[in-house]
C-alpha cells in the first residue's frame, strides 16, 4: 500500500536493502551445502538511495508438487518439513511463513520457497516453529527465550486489544 511507502523508505535507510540481503543469504546458505531452498539467478532493482522502488527476481523453477495440492501429508513428509526448517535455522535463516504453499515435494525431498530475508532472531525462529505446529501439527518441543518472548508479546497485544474493545487475535 502507498501509505507504507514512507515507512519502507525510512526503514530501508536504516536496515538496508531487504531483497539484496535475501539474495546474499540464499547464496551463502547454498554454498554451505543446504540445497533445500530455491536458488536466485538474478536480482535487478531500481533504487532511490537504499529504497527499492521496483525489483525483478529470477528464481529457480522447482519441479514437483506443492504441499497445498496434497490432501494428506504423511508423517515422513512432516518430518522432512520439520528438519528443513530446523536446518534453515542452523544456517542462519528463517522462513517467516512456513505454510503449505511455501514447500514443494521434489521427488523424495522437501524444497522451501518464498523465504524471508529478515534477521533470524530467536522470536522469528520460534514463530517458524509455532507456525509448523499450526499448519502441519508438528509439535514444537523447543521452549527457549524466543518462544517465551513471542508468547508473552502475543498475550500483551491481546490484552491491549481487549482494553481497546477489539477482538483478540
Task: Describe the role of every protein-language-model region.
Residues 19, 25-36, 65-101, 106, ...:
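Conserved kinase catalytic-core helix
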Residues 6, 64-67, 118:
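A short, flexible beta-alpha/helix-coil linker loop
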Residues 57, 65-68, 134-136:
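Histidine- and aromatic-rich ligand-binding microenvironments
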Residues 23, 79-82, 126, 130-133:
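Generic alpha-helical structural signal
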Residues 1-62, 90:
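Conserved ATP-binding subdomain of kinase catalytic cores across diverse folds
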Residues 13, 70-75, 123-124:
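Short, solvent-exposed loop/turn segments at secondary-structure boundaries
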Residues 105-169:
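C-lobe/activation-segment region of protein kinase-like
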Residues 51, 98, 124-127:
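A generic fold-level signal
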Amino acid at each position: 500500500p502507498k501509505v507504507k511507502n514512507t515507512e519502507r523508505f525510512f526503514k530501508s535507510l536504516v536496515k538496508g536493502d531487504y531483497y539484496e540481503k535475501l539474495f546474499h543469504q540464499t547464496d551463502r546458505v547454498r554454498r554451505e551445502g543446504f540445497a533445500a531452498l530455491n536458488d536466485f539467478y538474478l536480482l535487478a532493482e531500481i533504487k532511490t538511495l537504499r529504497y527499492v522502488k521496483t525489483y525483478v527476481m529470477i528464481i529457480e523453477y522447482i519441479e514437483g508438487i506443492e504441499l497445498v495440492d496434497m490432501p494428506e501429508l504423511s508423517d515422513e513428509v512432516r518430518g522432512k518439513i520439520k528438519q528443513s526448517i530446523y536446518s534453515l535455522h542452523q544456517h542462519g535463516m528463517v522462513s517467516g511463513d512456513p505454510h503449505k504453499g511455501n514447500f514443494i515435494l521434489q521427488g523424495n525431498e522437501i524444497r522451501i520457497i518464498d523465504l524471508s530475508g529478515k534477521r533470524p532472531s530467536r522470536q522469528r525462529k520460534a514463530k517458524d516453529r509455532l507456525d509448523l505446529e499450526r499448519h502441519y501439527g508438528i509439535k514444537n518441543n523447543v521452549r527457549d527465550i524466543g518462544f517465551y518472548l513471542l508468547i508473552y508479546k502475543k498475550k500483551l497485544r491481546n490484552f491491549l486489544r481487549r482494553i481497546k474493545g477489539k477482538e483478540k487475535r
